[in-house]
Every structure is written in structure tokens, then in C-alpha cells.
Amino acid sequence: MGIKYSNKINKIRTFALSLVFLGILVMYIGIFFRTHEVIMVLAMILGFLCIIASTAVYFWIGMISTRAIPVVCPECGKPTKVLGRVDACMHCDQPLTLDRSLEGKEFDEKYNLKGKKRVDG
């Protein structure tokens, strides 16, 4: 079948969700150190900072999501958002592009790189 691609917005949202779970896990581990107050407090603060970082990432991806170009996926027919020159459908992971020069070419996330590293095929 080939490499499975996923949508950039979904990747960042998954990262933010994992920060929430990591923060809760770190705080939960801190409870086991009730007898060592310093370790417990550090674990609670670290867990809290993970959750605050998650909030910042969710806010950031929300701002990016408002600027993303909405399109209808030709494969599944559902609305999705495209970031950059190439991206994948949020629902079916179908490779998408808005750049006519990339139509019919093999999907490569390197098309989104700026500068000298950019691949034009």
C-alpha cells in the first residue's frame, strides 16, 4: 500500500493531547512521593507546566487552523483543511495539494520545506 500520511493539524492536536496525559501522569506519580515533599511539589509543578504547555499548543494550532484553506476531499467527500503545499485529508488520509505543479506527482512532505531544501520534483 505505501506510506500512510496524516494531516498536520491532527498531528499537532495529538501532541497536545499527549502533553495533557503526560502532565496528569507526572502529577499522579508525584502523589507516591508524599513523604518527600520536594519531589512531590516538583512533580506537581512539572505536571502543571505540561498541561499549560498543552493549552498553549491547542491555542496555537487553533490560530493556525483558522488560516488553513478549507477544501472538500475528492476521496471521501468530507470537508478538510490544507496547510502548506501538500497535506493529507483529516478523515481518510488522502494526499492533497493545492499546487497545480504537484498534481500527479508522488506525495512528499518535503514539498512544504522552504528555501534550498525545497523539492520541486
Curated annotation (Swiss-Prot):
Pfam family, one: DUF2614
KW Transport (keyword) present: no
Keywords from the named record: Cell membrane, Membrane, Transmembrane, Transmembrane helix
Localisation: Cell membrane
CC annotations in GO: plasma membrane
Topology within the bilayer: Multi-pass membrane protein
Chief site of localization: membrane
Superkingdom: Bacteria
Transmembrane segments: 12-32, 41-61
Family the entry assigns: Belongs to the UPF0295 family.
HAMAP family assigned to the protein according to its UniProt record, in alphabetical order: UPF0295
Matches recorded under NCBIfam families: PRK02935.1
Name of the protein in question: UPF0295 protein BH0952
Source organism of the structure: Halalkalibacterium halodurans (strain ATCC BAA-125 / DSM 18197 / FERM 7344 / JCM 9153 / C-125) (Bacillus halodurans)
Source species taxonomy: Bacteria, Bacillati, Bacillota, Bacilli, Bacillales
